[in-house]
């Protein structure tokens, strides 16, 4: 509902959003949390098409830098449907649409007896390119939603990222939002577990 305006959604492509490599591209956190893989294609030296598969998390080498070779393009984006896995994403911006993110977060996980497992969490706006939040994933992995505390998340975020203000948001604001989005996602899971225990949905 918040991904671009109707004109952008009518003309833009997912491959273009990925290949652009913007630090605040909105599709990439979602695809990283879903462990997406790209198929890259180009015309080879002998006139035959050559393809290769690259995990999205290995696609970026720096700000607006990718592993794409001359003449190569993104042919396909593949990921598994969440199924029993939980998935949430949220974009923070000043306007509802036609605005660039201050940050966007996406998280996927599985419920293992009330514990969050196989956690994948990704952000844009915190690093030179959209990336998985590995240390935060480790801090969340195996815990129940009510076991996550603000101090731990704040400490991990402070240790994991360069504290740099941007044109659209200060570092302090982005760090606060990054933590609160994790809490929002896991609180949704806690509510779902409580509803499942009472037979309500």
Predicted segments with their positions:
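C-terminal structural segment of proteins
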Residues: 1-201
């Amino acid at each position: 509902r918040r991904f671009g305006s109707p004109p952008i959604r009518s003309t833009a492509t997912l491959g273009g959003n990925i290949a652009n490599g913007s630090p605040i591209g909105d599709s990439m956190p979602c695809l990283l949390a879903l462990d997406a893989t790209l198929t890259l294609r180009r015309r080879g030296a002998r006139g035959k098409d050559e393809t290769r598969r690259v995990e999205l998390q290995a696609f970026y080498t720096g700000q607006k830098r990718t592993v794409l070779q001359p003449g190569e393009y993104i042919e396909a984006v593949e990921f598994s449907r969440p199924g029993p896995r939980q998935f949430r994403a949220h974009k923070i911006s000043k306007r509802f649409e036609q605005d660039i993110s201050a940050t966007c977060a996406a998280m996927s996980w599985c419920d293992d007896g009330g514990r969050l497992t196989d956690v994948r969490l990704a952000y844009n706006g915190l690093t030179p390119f959209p990336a998985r939040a590995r240390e935060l994933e480790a801090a969340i992995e195996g815990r129940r939603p009510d076991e996550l505390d603000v101090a731990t998340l704040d400490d991990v975020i402070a240790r994991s990222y360069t504290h740099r203000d941007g044109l659209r948001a200060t570092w302090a604001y982005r760090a606060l939002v990054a933590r609160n989005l994790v809490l929002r996602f896991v609180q949704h899971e806690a509510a779902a577990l409580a509803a499942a225990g009472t037979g309500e949905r």
